[in-house]
Amino acid sequence: MYLFHNLKSRLDLCDEDKRVFDSYTGPVREVKKGSHLAREGEVLECLHLIEKGWACRYKMLRNGREPITSLLLPGDISDNGQGLYNRLDYSIKAITPLRFTTIDSESAERLFERPRILRLFKASGHISHSVAMNWIVNISARNAEGRIANLLCECYARSHAAGMTYQGRYFFPLTQSEISDVVGLSSVHVSRSLNKIKRKGLIESCDHRQIRINNWRGLAALGDFRAENLALPA
């Protein structure tokens, strides 16, 4: 069960709320890796609910760099609704092949009229805010290994909350270049730090772009990671 659907269960939506929510969700769409769901400067007219694959929000700098400001995993929604009708100050791009649905602005407004569904969007927004605060602390206060360890823990915790982990393994498709855009390090520094973490026996790479965490406590300690700070559902 993906995170947004996990939240639906957690907030005790009635059958009518669930029916209304599903009725206002658009058809499933699929796009290739690198495709844009939205671009900086565009007016936000719909919300994107990620079904399969990963996407990211990023900023385009004048020097051509594209620092990633947040990750969108299956079950995540691109905005809690507060950004509707405003110009985006970021872009959204698929970093793997992506499957998603949309909720247009008119449908979103109708959904917000239902108190429990409004709470659902607010809860999703609270999680996004908590993750963003964790990223700020990660970049400003941790060393290279700590930043990467924290990111690995965060993605595992978010995947676990969405029911997408198995025996310590989870899908982690980020390239070293993309990791560098998340944690603010060079690709070379990322490579060295990842190798150090692997040599410590904390993680190992698996097939199909998966990672296995062999020592959760050790990895969490290295990254000073605390899952409760992300406000994820139990």
Model feature map: region roles:
Residues 70-134:
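Cyclic-nucleotide recognition modules
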Residues 47, 69, 100-101, 171, ...:
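A residue-level structural signature of the nucleotidyltransferase/glycosyltransferase Rossmann-like core
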Residues 35-97:
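Cyclic nucleotide-binding regulatory domains
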Residues 31, 50, 213:
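Conserved catalytic Walker-motif region of ABC-type ATPase nucleotide-binding domains
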Residues 1-33, 76-78, 82-85:
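Cyclic nucleotide-binding regulatory module and flanking cytosolic helices
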Residues 119-184:
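Polybasic "coupling" helices that flank or enter modular domains
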Residues 26, 44-45, 170:
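Short loop/turn microsegments at loop-to-beta-strand junctions
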Residues 158-234:
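Phosphate-/nucleic-acid-contacting segments
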